[in-house]
Amino acid sequence: MRSIRLFHTSSTWLSKFKLDPNYKFKCGIEIHTQLKTKYKLFSLSPTSFYSTPNSKVSYFDCGLPGTQPKLNPEALYLALKLAVALDCEIQQNSSFDRKHYFYPDQPLGYQITQHYHPIAKNGFLELNSKFDEIKNSSKKINIEQIQIEQDTGKTTYDKFDKSVKVDYNRSNMPLIELVTKPDFEDLQQVRAFVKKYQTMVRHLDICTGDLETGAIRIDVNVSVNGNPRVEIKNLGSNSDIQDALKYEYTRQVDSIKNNEKIIQETRGWTGTKTVSLRLKEDAVDYRYVPDSELPFINLSPTIASDIKESLPELPEQILQKLTSKPYDLELKYARFLTENRDTLNYYFQLFKSVADRHHSGKLANNWFIHEFLGAFTKINVKVDLDILPANFLADLVLQVAEKNISTTSARLLLLQIIQTPEDKGKPIQDLIVQYDLGSPVDMSTEDLNDAVSDICSEIISNNADVVERIKKGQKNSIKFLIGLAMKETQGKVNAKTFSEKFNELLDL
């Protein structure tokens, strides 16, 4: 055992971790998801994440005698949305049960959940190598059930005065618990499933999808070579999930190698190792009984098809669309858009507006990803889609395509609009005139060519050392000359025009 402890004190073992084919990894996960409802699950208290402790608590939330629960239909609807999206079998009749245990954060003395008759069963989520970064071409993760339940209060242990404080704002918040089959065969599949699930609940506006804030909380069940499974509770980040699984798998493999018995238990993750919390409870310990104060949920036979018709395109369908014609986006950009609904809608509007008038979707892609979003990054401000409506950005892109403004001038104008609130909503053509950024339109082609020749000739004569490097084969040095020419003309003449003229004058 000493060698095991020494092994786990090293921080490098995590990066070198690898599953041993002689010791089969098997894993299932349970995901608790806070629903984005206006009110709590069984009371009219508003849901609140950042309010003053115990300021959003009804009589029922804190367990006062005589208070009764009333189901929030919005929570039911969100649970059904997720169940349909995951191809679950919706149960026409489901009910609530009481899970009894005593703890400060559970004032009722029991949790209302769906132990016997959950809202949905037998779904699945398909992973694939193209979008989910798994080794297999595809992997189907089966979902055992989805159930609705209430959250507990939040307990805080104050080390300074050794007090225990309970905030009941979270008590009775609506949750759905999703339980998978033990179908995960490696850590990549677990990571891919969690990320895909986060994207889905955000996309469907069911939950914020954040692990770090506790909106999603994950328990994992791990076993090796068919030995008793070990549960690890309340993993709060993707890195915690991966590290806890690596540690626990290695711990169990070491136990098997040393002929030590693996017991069925619940363990916690400290950040560096798993520690035993308690032996795994049998279901009878919780004394589940039907909740007599809540009626059965009776659903229409057509509820699944009705909800399916109301669902938006799911994230994987959008990824498939964005990475195919006519959009042809790189996967990393398609994934970014899929995870940001407002930005996705903006992109679709821009693409259609540009493609309809210019027949080039590539132009829209480049300007949206690299120029528009890049401009916000360049000046280190948060992206604000309202600053420049999609049809206005399309106008700017088309002005560049039609050579009414140079690319350099368009970039300058884009930065100006972002940094100048009073320019918001002004037509692009008016702004081009206002800032005198248009291409020279009062010059004939011959006069423009003569002017460009004069500028390029002067730059060549003033930069003999750069010209010498170009003639010796350092072709990229011509960009320096082009930059000087663009600066001289304040970006009004296209860089391509100067490039062609320099090549002509230098006989390249």
UniProtKB/Swiss-Prot annotation:
InterPro entries: Asn/Gln-tRNA_amidoTrfase_suB/E, Asn/Gln-tRNA_Trfase_suB/E_cat, Asn/Gln_amidotransferase, Asn/Gln_tRNA_amidoTrase-B-like, GatB, GatB_Yqey_C_2, Gln-tRNA_amidoTrfase_suB_CS, Gln_synth/guanido_kin_cat_dom. It is an enzyme of class 6 (ligase). The keyword Ribonucleoprotein does not apply. One of its GO terms (biological process) is mitochondrial translation. It catalyses: L-glutamyl-tRNA(Gln) + L-glutamine + ATP + H2O = L-glutaminyl-tRNA(Gln) + L-glutamate + ADP + phosphate + H(+). It comes from the Eukaryota. GO terms for molecular function: ATP binding; glutaminyl-tRNA synthase (glutamine-hydrolyzing) activity. Keywords: ATP-binding, Ligase, Mitochondrion, Nucleotide-binding, Protein biosynthesis. Its EC number is 6.3.5.-. The keyword Mitochondrion applies. GO terms for cellular component: glutamyl-tRNA(Gln) amidotransferase complex; mitochondrion. Pfam families: GatB_N, GatB_Yqey. It is found in: Mitochondrion. Its main location: mitochondrion. PANTHER family: GLUTAMYL-TRNA GLN AMIDOTRANSFERASE SUBUNIT B MITOCHONDRIAL AND PROKARYOTIC PET112-RELATED (PTHR11659), GLUTAMYL-TRNA(GLN) AMIDOTRANSFERASE SUBUNIT B, MITOCHONDRIAL (PTHR11659:SF0). Belongs to the GatB/GatE family. GatB subfamily. Allows the formation of correctly charged Gln-tRNA(Gln) through the transamidation of misacylated Glu-tRNA(Gln) in the mitochondria. The reaction takes place in the presence of glutamine and ATP through an activated gamma-phospho-Glu-tRNA(Gln). Subunit of the heterotrimeric GatFAB amidotransferase (AdT) complex, composed of A, B and F subunits. This protein may be expected to contain an N-terminal transit peptide but none has been predicted. This is Glutamyl-tRNA(Gln) amidotransferase subunit B, mitochondrial. It comes from Scheffersomyces stipitis (strain ATCC 58785 / CBS 6054 / NBRC 10063 / NRRL Y-11545) (Yeast). The lineage of its organism: Eukaryota, Fungi, Dikarya, Ascomycota, Saccharomycotina.
